[in-house]
Amino acid sequence: RIIHSFIYVRLLLHPLQYCLWDHFKQLSAMETRRIMNLAHLLADLVANFVVSLSVLKVIEFSDMRTMTPKVILHFRIFFKVFLTKYDDEVVLSAFKRIASTPELEGLRVKLAVFLHQHLVKGLVQAADSGISDDERMMLMRRFAMVKKAMESNSSVF
């Protein structure tokens, strides 16, 4: 929570974004615990509107050379935490923020594909993935909700 108090100083937003980008570049070499911690931190920052999902625009979700197993693990953890830990309104608002920006069309498409391939498909295929049926259903519902939100900036409710 300390980071939230610093974020109110607008001058620190860009250095934080650059710091996150530097960490994203190092994901393939990180230990699993550090990957998990970064995913949880990122989920908290996005959920509290400290950073936008647009911070992910530097990630080439469709490039198989950069999407190593550790990078995929990081973003699977991030999206699983973000989509299950926070309220519908928070999740919807975060995705609507990138839906209203035409320049982020490519990011929206890549996110939808990544979520479908690495989160939803895995939920459907692996009934024994260590998550409850309730959590699985919540993730499926949230995926449908955010996909709809990214496709249009009209109200989903």
Regions found by a protein language model. Give the residues of each.
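Alpha-helical interaction scaffolds
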Residues: R1-F157
